[in-house]
Amino acid sequence: MGGALGPALLLTSLFGAWAGLGPGQGEQGMTVAVVFSSSGPPQAQFRARLTPQSFLDLPLEIQPLTVGVNTTNPSSLLTQICGLLGAAHVHGIVFEDNVDTEAVAQILDFISSQTHVPILSISGGSAVVLTPKEPGSAFLQLGVSLEQQLQVLFKVLEEYDWSAFAVITSLHPGHALFLEGVRAVADASHVSWRLLDVVTLELGPGGPRARTQRLLRQLDAPVFVAYCSREEAEVLFAEAAQAGLVGPGHVWLVPNLALGSTDAPPATFPVGLISVVTESWRLSLRQKVRDGVAILALGAHSYWRQHGTLPAPAGDCRVHPGPVSPAREAFYRHLLNVTWEGRDFSFSPGGYLVQPTMVVIALNRHRLWEMVGRWEHGVLYMKYPVWPRYSASLQPVVDSRHLTVATLEERPFVIVESPDPGTGGCVPNTVPCRRQSNHTFSSGDVAPYTKLCCKGFCIDILKKLARVVKFSYDLYLVTNGKHGKRVRGVWNGMIGEVYYKRADMAIGSLTINEERSEIVDFSVPFVETGISVMVARSNGTVSPSAFLEPYSPAVWVMMFVMCLTVVAITVFMFEYFSPVSYNQNLTRGKKSGGPAFTIGKSVWLLWALVFNNSVPIENPRGTTSKIMVLVWAFFAVIFLASYTANLAAFMIQEQYIDTVSGLSDKKFQRPQDQYPPFRFGTVPNGSTERNIRSNYRDMHTHMVKFNQRSVEDALTSLKMGKLDAFIYDAAVLNYMAGKDEGCKLVTIGSGKVFATTGYGIAMQKDSHWKRAIDLALLQFLGDGETQKLETVWLSGICQNEKNEVMSSKLDIDNMAGVFYMLLVAMGLALLVFAWEHLVYWKLRHSVPNSSQLDFLLAFSRGIYSCFSGVQSLASPPRQASPDLTASSAQASVLKMLQAARDMVTTAGVSSSLDRATRTIENWGGGRRAPPPSPCPTPRSGPSPCLPTPDPPPEPSPTGWGPPDGGRAALVRRAPQPPGRPPTPGPPLSDVSRVSRRPAWEARWPVRTGHCGRHLSASERPLSPARCHYSSFPRADRSGRPFLPLFPELEDLPLLGPEQLARREALLHAAWARGSRPRHASLPSSVAEAFARPSSLPAGCTGPACARPDGHSACRRLAQAQSMCLPIYREACQEGEQAGAPAWQHRQHVCLHAHAHLPFCWGAVCPHLPPCASHGSWLSGAWGPLGHRGRTLGLGTGYRDSGGLDEISRVARGTQGFPGPCTWRRISSLESEV
């Protein structure tokens, strides 16, 4: 009875105080009741200081009411709250709920649903048990729900890759919801969670301890997630310690329910226990109450600004509850969106904060709760690893199941990425890893590490090892170096972390070598690697001088400055001193354009041969010069072939890849010998640099200035052309080549490896983990797991085997250099052109005519003669190419003989036809000169051939005559009959008149008659003064006559179709005219022809050649009548009868013009034909008496050439013979022609 009067008197006094405030003031104020769930000293002190002056900074006037409730009796609690609501006009209630006041929270939720009064829980103790709340309840909580706590706990598990765990619960209310939430979060996550076991224990007073021990000993998991109250948690951890589940090798995580108050944790709580609490876990009671009152005041003020009045106070509990009024619903909606002091206090429809800020706390070795992480805006930030070994001092603690692993970022073995910005977690197939940094939380705490996500080949190996060997780990990235190098006696990198026992294990692209093996233990290699070289394909952009790059500048200079000049001078010198070619009389030349082979023509010839240029050139005539030109032509072929073969590699750069045979290749050992110098490097402080420094010191000295900071920098330098080759681990380079965008990077030799080694896991010396890890790695190799991982991580779409040449079009960038050269040449040509005109029109007229400047004229003439050449008067004019189609008779006979040769099958006749064909071709090979005038017989007086004065009398030669002492005259073939009427020609002067006596007259005197009388100069029948175009047959030094050269095919005129069609008609006409003598009527030899009187010419007037029939014409040799070759006398007689002028033009020439068919006036002829005097060659037909027996007439043998050479030289010097003629024996078929 007395117990019930105390609260009643208290409420009565409160209501009296409230009524004394006056109505005027109450209308503008807001009444808030603050209910404390306990009567401890802190609550008593705060209740004494809680006054309206504590809330002056709020927009409304607050009238606080403090109430203390008895939590042991729910009925008394209900009576007190309902009496308060009925006596005072309360707008809202702020309730301090501890974790042990779940019954109070349920009663408050029921009262709110009945009276619609807003109730705000500020400590979060009721958040675990109030799921869901009553319908129509306005109960709001600043704590977090069980689902939100589970979400943070799973993020912690994911942070350290604790994917395997077991769940332990008690029979505390809500344990079924907890298990359901665990399964829901695990199923919704992308992480492959493994729920090893679920155990529900009776942890209350008097529970079966033996059963609890047995169930706990059956658990085999590194991580445990427990759900129970604080009292039950003390019992659970005591039993777990006895079962061996508490210690550094096990991790325990509990929700906020198991912690209770964070002021003094129980002694049974293990070190390293992890839990999740709200950010207000360190706030005082005054700050919590102030936040709750501020939320109610700000919501009411928002309602007042919109509606102009405050909401009505709450109703009485004893009144039957009706529907919620619109004003109450509006006021509740304003409470759901409140911001206070920069914090968002937005509530969900379930009454929980939408974006709560939570912290992860852990019990450190000093048995104090320490914040190790923060959950903010859906992202978890870990301050540093939660394991107690990683306290602020980072002092390591011995642990048999948890390892610290150091690694280093290097693709594809370890790839580091940033967490997902939306969730703050790592994406699938990645592992959280940390790196030292200076990150600062919003609360002002400094995080010494930054959370990152690691993946790659080595990370997958580590995850498999942790699953098989059964250990937990946390991963961090080294920042004090690379793989590991000893610098000034101190090891850095991953090796240094293991050596100085800051890490239990190091995994990554860590090469096994002897120096490292002395201080740490390595596992068996899990990847085979070595040293390889990477180069870049060309991107197709070439320099303007790419067309010059197939040869070095030294080769170009040697080619065009040295070789071309030296060979040109050599060819010129050989030609200069050749006895048959060069005109050495340059200085006396009077006219340019002669056939002289100059130094300029030599350079032009060699230049044309180099570039296969079809330009008009003049070839040398000397044998030695020709050999030199042929050797130069062969050299030019090799030069052009080598240039063309290498040009494509420089014009199409994407097809070019540098190749090296190994580290001992000359490109690495002698890089300065290359053009340009070969540039290569590596990443320092690694095994690759150590290997090169130890074995190739000169190579290492050169590559130091090209070393790169990282692999990514090296790849960029290769693509930009700053580096020619990059030397590094083969496994890394193969991955980079396979994943390169555009496949621009390749490793030489399809991934050829030098200094083969492997990657291993580094552990501390004599580590007990070595054997287990070696067995696991060998198992992975045997099961094919390693090969699968290599396929995933170490292969790419770009393969080194795809090095076939890809054809592509050349664009303007490839050919820019050639166009630039052409433009420069055009510019230089314009400058030379302008200078030429300036000199010709201006400068040369300004130079005064002075004898002092004659040296300039001589110098200019010398340069011009050197490059153009001159022709002296002694040089014979160049002969024109013969025209075989000028005489239709010759063409007809030539075609006839060719057709006859095709029809003849016998070898002898065919050979005769060949010789006859050459004979006909030789007829047209002589120079066509104007014919001599027909001359009368000797009895008719002076010769009317040329109207020139008689030469002065000269002494008669001493002796001259035919070889046998008679009057036989050897003449050449008779001229052809004219094809058209002769045309008069211009008169010519007597060019045969010389002031000195010819040498041949003094050596061989001419005599005639039977008495041996010497003929005077005017009586000589063969005077050289009557024939202006003569020829003399000459022989070589062996006695064989020179054969005339046949015209080249390009000199022959082309026959049209109408001329070719006449072939058959010409053949018929050639053999059908007149009677053809049979072969039996022809003489078998020349001697037989002279033995027959009828074969002698009729021109002889002596008695021995008279005929009974008085026939005046000599009998012609048997030939085709289509030729109709008359003897010279007939031609002369026909010319006189026709009244032709003295000059017969174009058809009848001197006897030497057709000098291939010999005729002879033998010894029986007393007189020679008068016109034979025009053939000056007759003077040399007979030599001295000592040579007469060997002179070739129509007799037996060949003429000795002993005196013919000199006769030929004299004749050329006086008459200017146009060319040599040939004397040879003729066959019967040729004589027939």
UniProtKB/Swiss-Prot annotation:
Q: Which residues are glycosylated?
A: 70, 73, 337, 438, 539, 685
Spell out the disulfide connections. 82-317, 426-453, 433-454, 743-798
Is Membrane set as a keyword in this record?
A: yes
Q: Intramembrane features: residues?
A: 599-611
Q: Where in the cell is it found?
A: Cell membrane; Postsynaptic cell membrane
Any idea which UniProt keywords this protein has? Calcium, Cell membrane, Disulfide bond, Glycoprotein, Ion channel, Ion transport, Ligand-gated ion channel, Magnesium, Membrane, Phosphoprotein, Postsynaptic cell membrane, Receptor, Signal, Synapse, Transmembrane, Transmembrane helix, Transport
**Ranges annotated as spanning the membrane:** 555-575, 627-644, 814-836
**How is it placed in the membrane, per its record?**
Multi-pass membrane protein
Q: Which Pfam families match?
A: ANF_receptor, Lig_chan, Lig_chan-Glu_bd, NMDAR2_C
- The molecule here is called Glutamate receptor ionotropic, NMDA 2C
What organism does this protein naturally occur in? Homo sapiens (Human)
